[in-house]
């Protein structure tokens, strides 16, 4: 494997990574408040005043940011995408270091969002700064998109899609943590809420009631059996269906009249969410016919498709070649969680990869942390990819 040792790329240092990443982590952008507008301003302060950018406001405190490096043509180009929000910190007392102090110990920076995914944001900023310093006009435009609300409903990337600024790009790099590999696929998410209305009775006379808790459990069990026995993806494995919330019951001696279950179904490419919904409706339909008086409602809470980019696409071939040059593994990786790709790729239908610093297994964890060398390595990946294919 060729190691990166070209002096042209030596200007990106771990010290630069540390300085930028500390500034990002020290801004609290935890859900549900977000406060990404403040972080967008901090990012702009790191860059020259004459850059081309658009700030898309979602509320008084929440915003997304698009920075554009104009190309020789307006058609095509590439977009780097990273989100600015993070999940909540949880119990602060469980952290070894305050989650927004961005403490560095050796090569490791600790803090909420360090891996997911302000490390990726820092790598994007370093690549952007390098791009601006070259003072060269790329063949096609290059976009750096910093989004809000990825950890919830995705209002940031949806706002960017609605704005249309990046909708003509040829390819997208999602800068989420990919564990020193290149991701070419991600699971979809299909969340269902199933509510059963039965009939209340004394628990000593279950024959006079309709036990909503028991029937919601039976419905979910039948659905899981159908969903989890489908096709196997070579990287992502199988579709999974997990009951993540179950509510019902009044007292021990009362047959429960209502019950509610929420399912988090993670699908692999090729599995139709419409088909899963149809299966759910069919099971519910059988229950309605067999149990006189039972009522069942099904609500779709989240619907994001599974995505995959062909290994034969130019983007995958080129990014793998570039990864090898900077010491990143060319092993295929799949992501079990969804990213901003789930809300932009279906709209513009272009190839994408997931390639960013850090270990995705540390996302959302207590004592979340990232290697500064990993941030530097991915900054150089973006830099070298742009130098090779866009300058």
Model-derived regions: residue spans:
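Acidic/His- and Gly-rich active-site-bordering loop/insert found
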Residues: 2-112, 133-138, 349, 359
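Acidic-glycine-rich active-site phosphate/pyrophosphate-binding loop
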Residues: 89-105, 168-169, 184-195, 321
